[in-house]
From Swiss-Prot:
Name this polypeptide is given: Vacuole-localized protein 4
Function: Vacuolar protein required for aerial conidiation and conidial maturation. Also involved in blastospore production and cell cycle. Plays a vital role in the secretion of Pr1 proteases for cuticular penetration and hence contributes significantly to host infection and virulence.
Recorded GO CC terms: vacuole
Keyword Signal found: yes
Signal peptide: 1-19
Mutant lacking the gene: phenotype: Affects proper autophagosome formation, asexual and blastospore development, and virulence. Leads to severe defects in secretion of cuticle-degrading Pr1 proteases and melanisation of infected insects. Reduces the transcript levels of all autophagy-related (ATG) genes including ATG1, ATG5 and ATG8, except unaffected ATG26.
Protein keywords: Signal, Vacuole
Cellular localization per UniProt: Vacuole
Principal location listed in the UniProt entry: other
């Protein structure tokens, strides 16, 4: 009995040490592996497995997901690819897959989503070139051309985050090499300028009666009746 108790004590001590060495769920351990919660269910065929005595997130092939030199989730790496969170689920058929050892957001075809730079990078990328004439490659970063997500560009178009899902049939599409929010018809949503064009979310003109005065609603109808009576 004493031998059994001693073995149990040693095993408990080893388990305690192993647990202490494990990173908290949601963090990366000293080897850059993503620590998961075994009680959670993860998307994209990923699972929480015990590896080296710690619960680690593994991909569909059972390999641990490494952070290594990957960009932080929500940022772009040095190749302009969007870094994602392997524990999150993404819209529009997008998914978070391990590419070259890093969790990257890929489209429905499994190709990494690349931030547009104004030039085509060839096969295997999802960069979209503009229908306008080709421009020389910029030596600056791609972010210098596109407005930050949540801001408007110089043309008043809303810059969006390709990893987000937007309501009312709106989608985030790459137009003129920048991610822009589009309405259900695929047209960019433009910030209202008061020009009264009535397109792309701009306000329409109010009815004009008489010498340029602006009347709306019932007042416009009354004014029209008065003019007709005269």
């Amino acid at each position: 009995m004493r031998v059994s108790s001693a073995i149990f004590t040693i095993a408990s001590g080893i388990a305690a040490v192993s647990a202490a060495d494990c990173a908290a769920a949601g963090d990366y351990d000293s080897q850059g592996r993503y620590s998961c919660n075994p009680a959670h269910q993860y998307p994209n065929g990923q699972s929480c497995k015990t590896i080296d005595g710690c619960p680690l997130l593994a991909d569909a092939s059972g390999q641990p997901i490494y952070k290594s030199t990957c960009a932080a989730p929500g940022d772009y790496d040095d190749k302009g690819r969007y870094s994602c969170n392997p524990a999150h689920q993404y819209p529009n058929g997008q998914s978070c897959k391990t590419v070259e050892g890093c969790p990257l957001l890929v489209d429905a075809n499994g190709q990494p989503i690349v931030k547009a730079t104004g030039t085509s990078t060839g096969t295997g990328t999802v960069t979209v070139t503009s229908s306008a004439a080709a421009q020389p490659t910029s030596t600056g970063t791609p972010s210098s051309k596109c407005a930050a997500p949540g801001d408007y560009d110089s043309k008043g178009r809303y810059s969006c985050n390709p990893a987000h899902q937007y309501p009312n049939g709106q989608t985030c599409k790459v137009i003129d090499n920048c991610p822009l929010l589009c309405d259900a018809s695929g047209k960019p949503i433009v910030k209202a300028t008061g020009t009264g064009s009535g397109n792309n979310g701009k306000p329409t003109d109010l009815p004009i009666v008489g010498a340029g005065s602006v009347l709306t609603g019932g007042m416009a109808m009354v004014a029209a009746a008065v003019v007709a009576a005269i």
